[in-house]
Amino acid sequence: MVMIATTSPDRITRRPQTNNVYGQIVAPDGLRPVVVALEKALGPGCVSMFNPRPGAPEVIRLRTDVADFESLALPGGMDHLFNGSVAGSAEDVAAFARRVSAAMVEAKIEHTFDVVNAGRVALTLP
């Protein structure tokens, strides 16, 4: 199933079926500061935090018209993978990743993002 994302009334882009942005976030104070930073950068309502089952680590889900990301806690609880797909050209994907990374930098959240294009890392942030 291919997800269709509308970026403007006259332009339709397809969100990739595989991830094209791979990230890692260090969150010693939990995921709430990450949610706040993401919503500040991308707008309210596009990020949710939930527990998938009792006793499981919290998960962040980011959904916009052009992006779909989800976190995965790594052993130890402070480090989280934050991978997802962004629709659009290579430049659009890089711009989205830069925007998210800038929000993390501003919030003093340690992170890394790799933007992948054609199977190769095209950009590493910050």
Protein language model features and the residues they cover:
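Structured alpha/beta or helical-core interaction and ligand-binding surfaces enriched in interleaved
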Residues: 1-126
